[in-house]
C-alpha cells in the first residue's frame, strides 16, 4: 500500500535547523578546503620564501620531482579536520546569530556583518590548532610531521601544552573575521541583486535555479574575500613558521613586516584569488544544495 505520508519538514530556527546548517557547513568546508591542498601548499611556501619557486606550475613540478607526487597533498589531514570544524561553527553559527541579531536590529548589512564576525570568532578557536599544524607541516622541508596526529603530538611536546597551537590565533582572527564578514555580507547582497534583476522571483524558481545563483554569487564574493584577507593570510604563514620562542605577537608581527614590507603582504595574491573564488563558490553551491535537499530555503 502506497503511503501518502509527507516527509517531515524542518522548522526554521529550531535546534534541528541549526544542527542541519552545522552539518551543511562541515560538508561545504572540509572537503573543499582539503581538495585545494596542493594550491595552498605552494601559496604558503611562496609566502614564507618568495624566491622558492618562479611560478605555481614550477612549484608543483619541483615538489613532485624532489619530494614525490604524494607530497603535493602535504597538510591534507590537518586541513580537512580543521576546516570541517570551522565550517560547522561558521555556517551553523552564522544562521544562529543572524536570527538572534535580527530580533534586535533591522535585517540587513549590519546584521550580516555582526553575525558573520561572531560566528567566525568562535569557529577559529576550533580551527587554530589544525591551521598551526598545517602551516608548519607545509613550510618546513622536509615536513616536520607525517600526519595530523603526529603533528599534534610533536607540537604539544615541544611547547609543553596548547600554547604552540594558539600562537597564531590573533593573526588568524585578523585574516578570517574580515574574510568571513566579506564572504557572507557580499554574498547576501550580491545574491539579492541577482534575484532583483531576474525575470522570476526567488520563490518561483526551482532548486537548481536558486543554487546556480548561489554559485555565481559565491564566486564574486570569493574574489572580494581574497583581497580583503590576504595580508593577514601572509602574516599567519610567517608567524607560524618564523615566530621565535617567547616572542610576543606584536614584536613578531613588527619584525616580520620590517623584513617583507608592504609589498610582501601581497605575495601569492593571484593564486589566492583563484583559490578562494573557486573555494567560496563551491562552498555556497554545496551548502545551499544541502539545504535545498533537506527542504530548507537557500541563503539570500
Curated annotation (Swiss-Prot):
Mind telling me which PROSITE patterns this protein's record contains? SOLCAR
Any single GO BP term = copper ion transmembrane transport
Q: Which InterPro entries match?
A: Mitochondrial_sb/sol_carrier, Mt_carrier_dom_sf, SLC25A3/Pic2/Mir1-like
Indicate where this protein resides in the cell: Mitochondrion inner membrane
Q: Which GO terms describe its cellular component?
A: mitochondrial inner membrane; mitochondrion
Tell me which Pfam families the record gives.
Answer: Mito_carr
Keywords linked to the UniProt accession: Acetylation, Membrane, Mitochondrion, Mitochondrion inner membrane, Repeat, Transmembrane, Transmembrane helix, Transport
Q: Where are the Solcar repeats?
A: 16-100, 107-193, 209-293
Q: How does it sit in the membrane?
A: Multi-pass membrane protein
Lineage, top-rank taxon, reads Eukaryota
Chief place of localization: mitochondrion
> Which molecular function GO terms apply here?
copper ion transmembrane transporter activity; phosphate transmembrane transporter activity
Q: Where are the transmembrane segments?
A: 22-42, 70-89, 108-128, 171-192, 211-231, 260-280
Chain positions with N-acetylmethionine modification? 1
Q: Which PANTHER family match?
A: SOLUTE CARRIER FAMILY 25 (MITOCHONDRIAL CARRIER PHOSPHATE CARRIER), MEMBER 3, LIKE-RELATED-RELATED, SOLUTE CARRIER FAMILY 25 MEMBER 3
Miscellaneous information on this protein: Present with 2360 molecules/cell in log phase SD medium.
Q: What does the function comment of this entry state?
A: Transport of phosphate groups from the cytosol to the mitochondrial matrix.
Give the similarity note. Answer: Belongs to the mitochondrial carrier (TC 2.A.29) family.
Spell out the protein name for this chain.
Mitochondrial phosphate carrier protein 2
Encoded by which gene? PIC2
Amino acid at each position: 500500500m502506497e503511503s501518502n505520508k509527507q516527509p517531515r519538514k524542518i522548522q526554521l530556527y529550531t535546534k534541528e535547523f541549526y544542527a542541519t546548517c552545522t552539518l551543511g557547513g562541515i560538508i561545504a568546508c572540509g572537503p573543499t578546503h582539503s581538495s585545494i591542498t596542493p594550491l595552498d601548499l605552494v601559496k604558503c611556501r611562496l609566502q614564507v620564501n618568495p624566491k622558492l619557486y618562479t611560478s605555481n606550475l614550477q612549484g608543483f613540478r619541483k615538489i613532485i620531482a624532489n619530494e614525490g607526487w604524494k607530497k603535493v597533498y602535504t597538510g591534507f589531514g590537518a586541513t580537512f579536520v580543521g576546516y570541517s570544524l570551522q565550517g560547522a561553527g561558521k555556517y551553523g553559527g552564522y544562521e544562529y546569530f543572524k536570527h538572534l541579531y535580527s530580533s534586535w536590529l533591522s535585517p540587513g548589512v549590519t546584521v550580516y556583518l555582526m553575525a558573520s564576525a561572531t560566528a567566525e570568532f568562535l569557529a577559529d578557536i576550533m580551527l587554530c590548532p589544525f591551521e598551526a599544524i598545517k602551516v608548519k607541516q607545509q613550510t618546513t622541508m622536509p615536513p616536520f610531521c607525517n600526519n595530523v596526529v603526529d603533528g599534534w603530538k610533536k607540537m604539544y611536546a615541544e611547547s609543553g601544552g596548547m600554547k604552540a597551537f594558539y600562537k597564531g590565533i590573533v593573526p588568524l582572527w585578523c585574516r578570517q573575521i574580515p574574510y568571513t564578514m566579506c564572504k557572507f555580507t557580499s554574498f547576501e547582497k550580491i545574491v539579492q541583486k541577482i534575484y532583483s534583476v531576474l525575470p522570476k522571483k526567488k520563490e518561483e524558481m526551482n532548486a537548481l535555479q536558486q543554487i546556480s545563483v548561489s554559485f555565481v554569487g559565491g564566486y564574486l564574493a570569493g574574489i572580494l574575500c581574497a583581497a580583503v584577507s590576504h595580508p593577514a593570510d601572509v602574516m599567519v604563514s610567517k608567524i607560524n613558521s618564523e615566530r621565535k620562542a617567547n616572542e610576543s605577537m606584536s614584536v613578531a608581527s613588527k619584525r616580520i613586516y620590517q623584513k617583507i614590507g608592504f609589498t610582501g603582504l601581497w605575495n601569492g595574491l593571484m593564486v589566492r584569488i583563484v583559490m578562494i573564488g573557486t573555494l567560496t563558490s563551491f562552498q555556497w553551491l554545496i551548502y545551499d544544495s544541502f539545504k535545498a535537499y533537506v527542504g530548507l530555503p537557500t541563503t539570500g
